[in-house]
Amino acid sequence: RYTGDSEDEIGVLGKSMNTLSEKLKETIGELKTANNELQKDIEEKIRIDEARKEFIANVSHELKTPIALIQGYAEGLTEGMAEDPESRDYYCEVIQDEAGKMNKMVKQLLTLTALEFGNDKPVMEQFDLVTLINGVLSSAKILLQQKGAQVFFDASEPVMVWADEFKIEEVVTNYLNNAMNHLDGEKRIEIRLEKNDKEVKVTVFNTGQNIPEEDLGKLWTKFYKVDKARTRAYGGSGIGLSIVKAIMDSHNKACGVQNVKDGMEFWFTLDCSV
């Protein structure tokens, strides 16, 4: 770098070289920034492509069984294999049940995709969490009775929170469904609220088998199933907990799971309303 103050030709040349050097440095910096951005774009494209391939593979795998069953039973009806009304009714029930499972999975996938891509942002409002939970329990009353579940939720005072009421209802519903589907032993479900000045923690406990510690973190991954046979039996898709995680991420709040004595606990936190 030229540091002189001469006004002759050497001085002018030196100052010109300084200016050129600064411009070159600035241009190189811009090129590095552009290159970094391009690299990020390439990595993001690769990530999206891999996610797309994984998504297609998973969806294809999940749809394979219900489509095969629907096709098989439909062909059975067409070929007259169900000769009596009782058999025909059974064939139709299987077809309707499998179609319902596919419909449920597609709806869950649409919900999850919208959440993951930020197209379904939470609409924040103040509401009573206790009223919401009681509403979910009331809606699930018949299912709980069919499972022979004992449900304990003794919160009586309102607990006001700040969140998207519709989405939190979906979180509670998914946790409750998960508890019902993995209920065992005493068949007890407990919902507990722990509140401090800033947050409330909601915990849903169910008696049943523990999950291997190495599998706990995978539960939030879409299509992941610890017990595939059992999940298939109750019509699960392995998407419900992924939706929970996406909803809590959109609220910038935490959720988790842990093994406890005689069962499992799933939890999430919300901001208390001022």
Predicted regions: what is each one?
Residues 1-56, 74-78, 93, 222, ...:
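Membrane-proximal HAMP signal-relay module
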Residues 3-5, 123-128, 145, 150-159:
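Conserved catalytic submotifs in the C-terminal HATPase_c
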Residues 4, 93, 157-162, 166, ...:
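A short, conserved loop immediately preceding a beta-strand within the C-terminal catalytic
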Residues 29, 97-105:
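Short alpha-helical segment of the dimerization/phosphotransfer core of two-component systems
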Residues 117-122, 160-163:
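Conserved micro-motifs of the catalytic ATP-binding
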Residues 179-180:
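Short helix-loop "hinge" at the ATP-lid/N-box region of the Bergerat-fold HATPase_c
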Residues 186-198:
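Short beta-strand/loop element within the Bergerat-fold HATPase_c
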Residues 211-225:
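Short conserved segment of the HATPase_c
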